[in-house]
């Protein structure tokens, strides 16, 4: 559940942006969501934003766990968020089937559209613009080794996947929050929220429904998630709950998102619980958790190469690597000079210009024995390895 902006305290959350940061529960069941929500909502003097929720918090969210909540519910199907590309069809089919299951439980489905939705989402996005200031302020106050986004980038010790967003944030003008563009985007956020609520009011809807993402989760490590619909809740401050909708033919889990009016978490909990109890789409992962995180063990190809590297830092860490371009697997055997218990992690870094392009962990602290293992390399990591930049 992503709660309404202002329902719960943000104190202690590493911030991305003032206009859309909110913390909510992630759980296996809707009942667990309601239990955690009861324990975490309300005013906190360390964060004045929950004052907006005064008078809007029920005595107990668990009271809305009702199996018949879908009966007579009116759900707006936000058709634009299903996408039209062939790659969108697989997820869309699963979510449409889930909506038919809601209909079978008594819900009425109404196809709806928010005027100029794509344009409004683009005009109201503030994630990268605010990141420089709010994350930077957090880093400065934390007393850690870096005190700004610029210093974080300079260290090269950020997750490689964040390179793009951190670059954009770092290039935001220092006076941006006092400028006209920021004011326009704030106004656009208000306009977007009003447009969504108008659609819900005009059609007497209890919620909107759409895929959490339009496409299936990508194959790691080189895939990037495409087609996220998370921006609507984030940029309006309205609550949204993702519920298991089923699985693709290939066994990939798919979620349906239910969006409600501000502080309508009780409604979302009821609808989600009713759907969950009727369908039981969630099932435990098919893996045990004991499998290796690296690529499967295979005989090395003819073009496999081995090389030695010694990393220096607080400790000396000599390592032997084996790279097989056939499988893109990078095997490693690390023999640190200190006890493995004293090492928090060993990382691969990709050099970009004069700084690193972020880091990817190849080793987490695993025990007292010298670690060996393997991981698959992403496309940019393979290219960096071949040019001496990994």
Q: Model regions: which residues?
A:
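Short, surface-exposed loop/helix-turn segments at secondary-structure junctions
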Residues: 53, 180, 203, 212-231
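General small-molecule cofactor/ligand-binding pocket signal
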Residues: 108-113, 241
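Small-aliphatic-rich amphipathic alpha-helix that forms the alpha element of a beta-alpha
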Residues: 119, 195-198, 221-244
């Amino acid at each position: 559940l992503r709660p309404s902006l202002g329902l719960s305290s943000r104190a202690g959350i590493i911030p991305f942006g003032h206009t859309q940061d909110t913390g909510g529960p992630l759980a296996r069941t809707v009942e667990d969501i309601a239990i955690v929500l009861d324990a975490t909502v309300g005013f906190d003097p360390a964060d004045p934003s929950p004052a907006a929720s005064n008078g809007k918090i029920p005595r107990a969210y668990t009271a809305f766990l009702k199996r018949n909540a879908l009966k007579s519910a009116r759900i707006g199907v936000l058709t634009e968020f299903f996408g039209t590309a062939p790659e969108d069809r697989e997820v869309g089919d699963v979510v449409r089937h889930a909506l038919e299951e809601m209909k079978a439980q008594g819900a009425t489905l109404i196809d709806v559209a928010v005027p100029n939705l794509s344009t409004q989402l683009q005009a109201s996005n503030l994630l990268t613009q605010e990141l420089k200031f709010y994350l930077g302020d957090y880093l400065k106050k934390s007393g850690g080794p870096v005190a700004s986004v610029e210093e974080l980038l300079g260290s090269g010790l950020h997750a490689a996947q964040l390179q793009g967003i951190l670059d954009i944030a770092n290039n935001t003008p220092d006076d941006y929050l006092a400028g006209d563009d920021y004011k326009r985007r704030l106004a656009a956020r208000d306009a977007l929220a009003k447009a969504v609520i108008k659609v819900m009011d005009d059609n007497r809807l209890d919620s909107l429904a759409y895929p959490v993402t339009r496409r299936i989760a990508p194959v790691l490590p080189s895939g990037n998630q495409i087609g996220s619909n998370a921006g609507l809740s984030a940029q309006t401050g309205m609550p949204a709950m993702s519920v298991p909708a089923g699985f693709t033919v290939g066994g990939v889990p798919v979620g349906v998102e239910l969006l409600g009016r501000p502080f309508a978490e009780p409604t979302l909990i009821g609808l989600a619980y009713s759907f969950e109890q009727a369908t039981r789409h969630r099932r435990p992962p098919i893996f045990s958790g004991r499998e290796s995180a690296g690529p499967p063990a295979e005989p090395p190809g003819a073009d496999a190469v081995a090389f030695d590297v010694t990393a220096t830092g607080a400790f000396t860490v000599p390592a032997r690597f084996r790279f097989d371009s056939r499988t893109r697997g990078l095997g490693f055997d690390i023999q640190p000079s200190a006890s493995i218990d004293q090492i928090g992690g060993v990382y691969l870094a990709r050099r970009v210009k004069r700084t690193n392009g972020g880091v990817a962990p190849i080793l987490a602290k695993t025990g007292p024995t010298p670690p060996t293992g393997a991981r698959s390399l992403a496309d940019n990591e393979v290219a960096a390895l071949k040019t001496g930049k990994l």
